[in-house]
Amino acid sequence: MIRTGNQYRESINDGRQVWIDGEKVKDICNHPSLKPIIDIRSRMYDMAHEDKYQEKLTYLDEETNELNTVYHKPPRTRDDWYEKDTAMDSLMHDIGGVVIRVSDETVGEMWSLFDGQDVLNEVDPQFARNIENHIIRATRDDPFHVSANTDPKGDRSRLPQDQDPDMLLHVVKETDAGIVVRGAKFETAAAYSNQAFVKPTIGGWAGNEKLSDYAVSFICDMGAPGLKHICRSGFSGRGSVEDYPLANNFDEVDTLLVFDNVLVPWENVLFYRHTSAAAFIRATLHRYSAYPFVTRIRYVADMMIGAALFNARQTGLDKHQAVREKLAMLACYREGINAHLTASIALAEKSPGGLLMPNQSLLLTGRVHACTRLPEMMHIARELCGGQICVTPNHAAFNDKESGHWLEKFYNVNENWVAEDRRKLLAFARDLLNSDYAGHRLTFQLFAQSPPFAHLNAVYNNFDFSGPLDFVRNAAGLSEKVMQQ
């Protein structure tokens, strides 16, 4: 089924405990830091019911004869991936910005665990059935699904058992109803989502230890008793929406999730204590989810290109060779991302679970390209936009009767670029490249799917080195013995 925006709002108005800026949130849907992004999320749901978008955003479930969201559909063909691209393009253009947490990028992590059914069956066949049931539920119930990965860390030179044991999420008790967990996780959008796929990120075990209370993964209801959401300060409302159009509409608030003896029903447990299952999910976690994650960065690249080119055109600088060179660098960055995404689906592979996974080497290489070059590309876009993004007065100054007169005079360029359009463009570019929100988003993109060194390690583990080795062996006339190492 597909839900409406109002149904989504009602589902998160469940009495969950949420704090922002030291105050407990009484009305989550109308809190100034959360309302804008909840409105965006509601819009995502409502779009699926509109004639203009329904065919692009949904598909017919042949078993239930109901419409389901394309975002959560397990991909089995290339067309499934192309349909996801179409749906995402419709969403981004409708809302006029970029959001990371749509659910497609986090549901994909469950597909990775689905591929590890043989590992789960060795642990407990019920866990394999649980993941299959939750994939079906995500497909048919249309929840806002997120992913809880990052721990508070603590002293990483010591095992969790040798410090405050709650620094890493762990099981403290088993009951007939399920497991009881303590600890904490950071998660984007948790405070206004329905459920999270919780999993370990750091091995809380040593050597060849096969069992650990820290090796646990489960689906958690974000309104569960004992769960506390402590949010970072929001960017919305710090300045006017006219001056900060992105920060005021697309701030996806991050949360420290505190698990204070939270009961997880057995049917929601995906694996427990077995380090082999934890190792598998860490190695394959982004097998599918890296695709929508990198796709989002492509849209960020489009915004940088558009903002930079408009800024160059308004003053006629787009005719200069040096300016075109930098614009071409932005275009190469964008097309490099797009090429990796396109090729990863064109050369997609069947997964162990029977799904169609993007070509891992190409996709993960594309992620490195997108993330590592993003700071450089933002700097180039900033150069192209020029210094006016840091010196232009705010919207109120343009509207003032006295100061507005002078701003109208000096910000009008010609009949095509009047003062108000220039002000809007400069405000957009400032929020995209220079604001607190822009800095936050840059750091988020660098670490959201693990740090840069882990991205490169994923490429190392998925690139086929046998071809280059064999090529050099033949070219250098080496014996077969060198291939046996």
Please provide the spans of the model-predicted regions:
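N-terminal-proximal low-complexity accessory segments that begin disordered
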Residues: M1-M47
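Generic structural signal for well-ordered, non-transmembrane alpha-helical segments
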Residues: K35, D39, I136-T139, Y299-D302, ...
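Internal helix-loop-helix
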Residues: D46-H145
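FAD-binding core of flavoproteins
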Residues: S147, P152-R296, N461-Q485
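Charged/polar positions within long, soluble alpha-helices
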Residues: T150, R313, A339-A346, P375-R382, ...
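Extended amphipathic alpha-helical segments enriched in small hydrophobics
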Residues: P292-S351
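Short, charged, amphipathic alpha-helical segments
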Residues: R324-A328, L356-T365
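Alpha-helix capping/hinge segments and adjacent helical runs
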Residues: S361-Q485
